[in-house]
């Protein structure tokens, strides 16, 4: 849903046995969305770790942004990682092959990854493995993920 999701979509994902979604930006760490249909883990994203803002420039869709250099465009990703690493948190980059996958950008990512992997206490994993891990540590009482009961509002909200 490109960072947009509705109650109906969440319920459809649950009804079709999806374990997680990654469309929302409501937290820095994964949490549970609970509806009358069941539960769905949300593995949150945010624009600070998405390569679209620094590298995308598409006249076809009227998205005309200045393209940043590899170092400048990726600097925010690395700063976001450091903050999450220091806090023992969760960090997820969104790297499109046609954006960050370009040679000069990927060289910068590769150098950074080599440094990060030397730390030995960093885990890179597919989202399904991350969600499985969260379920395991929640089941044995080591962690309690936040639970959002949905819908947030049972009727339209009027401002004014």
What label would you give each PLM region?
Residues 1-87, 141-143, 159:
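Active-site-adjacent pocket scaffolds in enzyme catalytic domains
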């Amino acid at each position: 849903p490109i960072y947009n999701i509705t109650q109906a979509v969440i319920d459809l994902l649950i009804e079709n046995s999806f374990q997680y979604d990654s469309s929302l930006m409501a937290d820095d760490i994964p949490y549970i969305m609970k509806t009358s249909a069941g539960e769905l883990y949300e593995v949150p994203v945010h624009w600070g770790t998405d390569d679209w803002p620094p590298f995308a420039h598409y006249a076809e869709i009227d998205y005309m942004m200045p393209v940043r250099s590899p170092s400048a465009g990726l600097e925010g990703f690395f700063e976001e990682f450091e903050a999450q690493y220091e806090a023992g948190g969760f960090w997820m980059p969104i790297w499109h092959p046609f954006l960050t996958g370009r040679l000069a950008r990927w060289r910068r990512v590769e150098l950074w990854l080599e440094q990060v992997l030397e730390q030995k206490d960093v885990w890179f994993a597919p989202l399904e493995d991350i969600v499985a891990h969260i379920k395991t540590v929640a089941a044995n009482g080591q962690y309690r993920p936040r639970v959002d009961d949905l819908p947030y509002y049972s009727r339209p909200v009027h401002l004014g």
